[in-house]
Amino acid sequence: VSVPMRALLGILATLLLALPAPASADQALAPEELFAAVCSSCHALGRQWDHRIGPPLGGLGNRPAAAIPGYPYSEALGSAKIRWTQAELMAWILDTNGRLNDTSMVYQNSLTPEETQRLARWLLEQD
């Protein structure tokens, strides 16, 4: 192997060592980062509707669905007898339209079940 080739191989080896390792459970996104990545373009935290596309997600813990005054919920969600528990919120995030037909929320879940669980637990703790 020539000297220039050895130098190139050395540079490549150094670059490969500098690449980040695959994410482990310790490096998983925090729930607030998951919220920022998949929820915040349509939803805010808090309890007052700020005219975003979706209703605010603060104070969800055991709150009935469609409970934010002034928000134009779909008829389906408005008439559903849903309370936001951990199980209900996880089912909603994992498959919104499978959970309730004719909802106005258009969302394709891109989270793993573990990420969904962390996000749901965190959302239920937000005021």
Question: What is the predicted function of each stretch?
Answer:
Residues 9-19:
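Bacterial N-terminal signal peptides
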Residues 21-25:
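Sec/Tat signal peptide C-region and signal peptidase I cleavage site
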Residues 67-90:
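Short Fe-S-cluster ligation motifs
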